[in-house]
Amino acid sequence: MPSRKKAAALRYNEEKENAPKVVAKGEGEVAKNIIKIAELNNLPIKKDEDLIELLSKVELDKEVPEALYKAVAEVFSFIYRTTNKS
């Protein structure tokens, strides 16, 4: 049986939050909708199957655990590089 598509959305406001939060997550149709909303809003999308498995275990609107900081920092670095191309 093929695995279902999974997706998560992160938010980080360094002035208000200590760490990034998982603000949306899901699989199947929910994942497709998360990706569609990101695309419609011109938000960068990074595929990382290992990280999505870990993020899918984080409760909604909760900060990512410290053990995931490095992996999540790499995602935000990717976003920064993608959105700040000149």
Please describe what each predicted stretch is.
Residues 1-86:
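Divalent-cation
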